[in-house]
C-alpha cells in the first residue's frame, strides 16, 4: 500500500498557497485568522 503523502511542490502551492487562499472567501478568513494570531507564515 502506498503512503498518502506524495509531496509535489506545484500541488502544495496550488492548494495551500497564498494566491489560492485569496481566491475564496473562506481562504481569506484563514489568512485573517492567521494574521490575527500573529503567524510568521500566513500560507505555504
Curated annotation (Swiss-Prot):
Gene Ontology biological-process annotations: translation
Location of the region described as Disordered in the Swiss-Prot/TrEMBL record: 1-44
Top-rank taxon, per record: Bacteria
Disulfide bonds: none
GO cellular component, one term: ribonucleoprotein complex
The entry's keywords: Ribonucleoprotein, Ribosomal protein
GO MF term list: structural constituent of ribosome
This protein's record includes keyword Ribonucleoprotein: yes
Similarity remark: Belongs to the bacterial ribosomal protein bL34 family.
Descriptive protein name: Large ribosomal subunit protein bL34
Organism: Nautilia profundicola (strain ATCC BAA-1463 / DSM 18972 / AmH)
Amino acid at each position: 500500500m502506498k503512503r498518502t503523502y506524495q509531496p509535489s511542490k506545484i500541488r502544495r502551492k496550488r492548494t495551500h498557497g497564498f494566491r489560492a487562499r485569496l481566491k475564496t472567501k473562506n481562504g481569506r478568513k484563514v489568512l485573517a485568522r492567521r494574521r490575527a494570531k500573529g503567524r510568521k507564515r500566513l500560507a505555504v
